[in-house]
Amino acid sequence: MSHISFKGCSFLSHLDSFQFDISSCQTIAASLVFATGGLFLLSRGLSFLRALFSIFILPGKSLSSFGPKGSWALVTGASDGIGKEYALQIARKGYNIILVSRSASKLSAVASEITSANPNILTKTVSMDFSENNDEDYEKLKDIIKDLDISILINNVGLSHSIPVPFVQTPEKEMKDIIAINCLGTLRVTQLVAPGMMQRKRGLILTMGSFGGLLPTPLLATYSGSKAFLQHWSTALASELEPYNIHVQLVVSYLVTSAMSKVRKASMTIPNPKAFVRSTLNHLGRSGGLFSYSHTSVPYWTHGLMAWGITSFLGAMSKTVLGINKSMHESIRQRALRKAARESGKKAQ
């Protein structure tokens, strides 16, 4: 009996030890979960502080660090909206301006506005339709700029869809125009300007990106793809030109009041061109809320916070973001189609 009792005690002893091991493992697992969660929250907290410092506190580089006053800035898509505002604000900082866009009359008006406000500033205008991708236009531009000290290039020219549209229904001309303007136009102008900057060992190249390139955007597939292309191209170019002391930066924006966005009223999340460009020029070299993307800036404060939140918690390429984007643009498309139907009905009457 005592022998049996001894074995029973031995079994109970092992059982207690086993239960203790399970309890210990559970405690360790819980500690690891809490530690991991704590590290995640700490990293996100530090990331948020970094974003706040970049957006609100740390100063950007001055334009004069990229080239002296009296040198030239070339701005594409300069006839109105963001491009016009870049030209006006850079001219006020003492740089001569080359205005490039399609409408000669609008370019002349912008040039007159610049010289009226800044009598010592020189301007040149180049009228060309980027959708044509015409070699003669680029040769003309090359001849005009060949002897100029261009220290700043603003790749602003761009085109989106007239309304959100499924890719298979996208008009062929619209599709080709978007690629010719957003991609080929930007590449060809940069290829004309960059060699001079490399010789002078200084310069600034800003290219307008978009949330549409950061986030895949259904019903704006061609536009979204063109802006995503610019994201990768600009970042790669930045690495190539960095040894020549040329700063290349993609500027990412959400909506800005403009003819292309079709938004007329400014709000906290949708600035007007003046406020957006001022923020961009004040944050040169700063990432805003998108520091996980090299050589990229989201300069306007609400856009920067939005970009930080999306990339930190949801993921720019996630199904959640994709679904939200799709629903939003499907709704915009339906409203646009209803508006077009109403206007067509009024004309028929």
Curated annotation (Swiss-Prot):
This is Very-long-chain 3-oxoacyl-CoA reductase. The active site is at Y223, K227. PANTHER family: HYDROXYSTEROID DEHYDROGENASE-LIKE PROTEIN 1, VERY-LONG-CHAIN 3-OXOOACYL-COA REDUCTASE. GO terms for cellular component: endoplasmic reticulum membrane. Its main location: endoplasmic reticulum. InterPro entries: 3_ketoreductase_fungal, NAD(P)-bd_dom_sf, Sc_DH/Rdtase_CS, SDR_fam. Keywords: Endoplasmic reticulum, Fatty acid biosynthesis, Fatty acid metabolism, Lipid biosynthesis, Lipid metabolism, Membrane, NADP, Oxidoreductase, Transmembrane, Transmembrane helix. It is an enzyme of class 1 (oxidoreductase). Belongs to the short-chain dehydrogenases/reductases (SDR) family. NADP(+) binds at L74, D129, D137, N156, Y223, K227, V256, S258. It comes from the Eukaryota. Its EC number is 1.1.1.330. The chain crosses the membrane at residues 29-49. It is found in: Endoplasmic reticulum membrane. It is a single-pass membrane protein. One of its GO terms (biological process) is fatty acid elongation. SUPFAM superfamilies: NAD(P)-binding Rossmann-fold domains. Pfam families: adh_short. Pathway: Lipid metabolism; fatty acid biosynthesis. It comes from Coccidioides immitis (strain RS). Component of the microsomal membrane bound fatty acid elongation system, which produces the 26-carbon very long-chain fatty acids (VLCFA) from palmitate. Catalyzes the reduction of the 3-ketoacyl-CoA intermediate that is formed in each cycle of fatty acid elongation. VLCFAs serve as precursors for ceramide and sphingolipids.
